């Protein structure tokens, strides 16, 4: 079967890998000059099934109001006359119940655990190297209140058999020795030993090279203008130059830009671009740098070790498709780094970056078929595209091939999210 994958980020390239492995003839289209140059370029670097959770949670509306007032706020909302944003926010608020949170977190953890295992298998199959480490994630709590609420997450982790450790200050220092330098600045943490870290951009580029050697065609610098359709099927992809490309099946994996592509087909995806920022800086003192990933719960910032670099990523800015780099967001990232790893790296040498995370209101991605019988979606992963990429690609390849998927998937499919526009 000939398959066109629209989008060359980590999710699209992982989809191409598993489709090619299943024996399909695959072509990937992307508007950039190479793979992984948009949202996958400089994300936080976490492969974190244990930390997979929806932003929509009990208490979030009140917390969000508090965050919006903070100087170093993890959430930024730019007032906009954009009905789609406010509709998306309303859907998110509707998912802030205890019942919805447990349901959404459960399916996210299920996909993320499957994806982490698929990544490990892919690594064994290919020998791919991408500055990965298998040393877990430490969610760090600065306040007793944060630590006292950890049971809300561990109950779901128990349900899905995800390993974890609740640590006191000494336990956190044992996991991340450099934190001894800031003893007293935190009270405890939640360690997720099964989590990993790695450079998503490097992974995407090297996996694309592996795919190319296995016969996958990559066409870069190609803009997808629209999808042609007839009688409930997609009949072709029209590019920005007017060229029409055809296939037997089509995968929409264009991140935050997927809804605009599908809207003319009468499909409305509840995916909104949530802007994130990162700093990437060289390690200046090995003993003062993180070992793996430390999640600063107060500022919602991830500080990750990637080889001889430190990646500091975070913030959630609701500003449409703006790519503007904003100084206050950099200040927040630098503040978190300075508080926890003040001597680990030199922020003056940091590369400052921003990307658009494709978020659904309930945190769950949209992976599976649509009402068009040869059109599939693989988008809406939010902050967890790197975590869920391999599992989503493998699941999608099974669905397109007609094989029974290895995990429950009905609640991940387009039928749950797609509706008539």
Curated annotation (Swiss-Prot):
Pathway linked to the protein: Amino-acid degradation; D-alanine degradation; NH(3) and pyruvate from D-alanine: step 1/1
GO molecular function: D-amino-acid dehydrogenase activity
Names of the cofactor(s): FAD
InterPro entries in alphabetical order: DadA (IPR023080), FAD-dep_OxRdtase (IPR006076), FAD/NAD-bd_sf (IPR036188)
UniProt xrefs under Gene3D superfamilies: D-Amino Acid Oxidase, subunit A, domain 2 (3.30.9.10), FAD/NAD(P)-binding domain (3.50.50.60)
This protein's record includes keyword Flavoprotein: yes
Keyword Flavoprotein applies: yes
An example Gene Ontology biological process: D-alanine catabolic process
Keyword field: FAD, Flavoprotein, Oxidoreductase
Binding site for FAD: 3-17
Biological function: Oxidative deamination of D-amino acids.
Protein name: D-amino acid dehydrogenase
Lineage, highest ranks first: Bacteria, Pseudomonadati, Pseudomonadota, Alphaproteobacteria, Hyphomicrobiales
